[in-house]
Amino acid sequence: SRMKSNSEKNYVLDFNTTSSLFKEEVQLEPTGGNQRWSMFSSLGSNEGTVYRDILSNAFIRKQELLGKTFLIKDTLTKSKWTMTGQTKKIGIYTCYNATQEVESEVRAIQFGRSSQRASENKDVPKKTKITTLSTWFTPEIPVATGPSFYSGLPGLILEVSDDNRTILCTKVVLNPKEKIKIKAPKKGTVVNNEEFKKIQEDKIKEMREQFGRGRRQGGGNRIRIQN
């Protein structure tokens, strides 16, 4: 057996052929009720709740930010996957490996006075980081979805990994006795993806300025932001 990390969370993916809902699981079994569900263990980040319309690629992500709830409504761009030819078993399912190169912006924001006024604390210029995203999907469950935003393959994605996290399916239940209702999240401030990124950046800047105005002398902290 292995120890469970403090940063490890359990999620459930409810899905049918037209929609899916990925959310953190707080119960041992999902209640309330569609046709299938699978349980994932995620190590490395907070995914929030993600609802996807599989046919249109539209999504709604429910995300908390400093005590406020946002509903991020937008459309996923089509992913360009490369099949590697590798296969492996995840549980009883034969899975195929697909990868893609993902470009993301990484910035470091410096906190602290260090003999400077808060207004002089500048953002470090944005840097672009390329990471390889690796997924394992099974055509034995022919539904083009997966955990979080991962999708676009001819089968259910059961495992995803990159430099920062791994999301692994630990259980799949097809046609459960209790029907599962897939409902899009509704409560929250509605924004699109770009608007939410801007809100995140503004909040970080606000925190930095408040920190700089505080009594703390010298030293500092650095926060890495990856979009």
Language-model features: locations:
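Extended soluble regions of mature proteins
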Residues: 1-227
